[in-house]
Regions:
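Membrane-interface amphipathic segments in extracytoplasmic regions
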Residues: 1-214
Length: 214
């Protein structure tokens, strides 16, 4: 999550959308007083037991959760900033995103669960990004960049915000196998149920072949 006062934008960092890399790139355009989750300390009222333990034993202060929701960010910055700044995020095909999540969270595990086993135990909120960029069930940002067209849409947003043209050039777009090769009917249906809002909002559909390269 980033709140940049100089360029008057708010970036809502979603899951499995190259959010950390985009946030790192955007952070180079920020200055003192801006809010960057990777470098901004969390308020003590947001601490979890583990945060208190690290503070007491190591003197380490917790950083902000990267995946702050739109509602949490609005509460932090206030209505005036929230309503006047350009707000954006990135969304990804739900089935593609689920496969990427599986790859990340099961890498190195032995034995490694199958994707069916992983999804059967996954919390629905871990599969859907919609709660992060909506408030009370309604879209709360000005632009949702489609991960399928990430490079072109990031460039367009950068131009809109007068950011340096080379800002996003170092970002690498991660590739996974096409989801139709690993998801069966049960897994497809589970993801459809968890991600129903974004599927309806953006018209996502289950594709049997890989789309063109980004």
């Amino acid at each position: 999550m980033i709140v940049c006062h100089q360029h008057r934008f708010i970036f809502v960092t979603t899951r499995k959308t190259s959010g950390a890399a985009i946030e790192a790139a955007l952070a180079t355009a920020c200055s003192d007083g801006d809010i960057v989750s990777a470098t901004t300390h969390a308020a003590l009222t947001q601490y979890q037991p583990g945060d208190w333990l690290r503070l007491m034993t190591r003197g380490e202060r917790a950083r902000l959760d990267r995946h702050q929701s739109a509602a949490q960010i609005r509460s932090r910055v206030g209505d005036a900033v929230w309503s006047s700044y350009f707000k954006f995020c990135v969304e990804r095909d739900p089935w593609d995103k689920a496969v990427a999540l599986y790859e990340q969270r099961t890498r190195g595990r032995d034995p490694r669960p199958t994707i069916a086993q992983f999804l059967a135990k996954a919390r629905p909120e871990s599969l859907s990004n919609f709660p992060l960029y909506s408030i009370d069930g309604a879209l709360a940002v000005d632009r949702v960049i489609r991960f399928e067209h990430l490079a072109a849409e990031l460039d367009a947003v950068g131009h809109l915000l007068n950011l340096p043209a080379e800002l996003f050039q170092a970002i690498e777009w991660p590739q996974t196998c096409h989801y139709s090769a690993v998801l069966g009917p049960a897994e497809r249906g589970l993801i459809e149920a968890a991600c129903a809002p974004e599927i309806e909002l953006f018209g996502y559909g289950f594709a049997e072949v890989a789309p063109e390269d980004r």
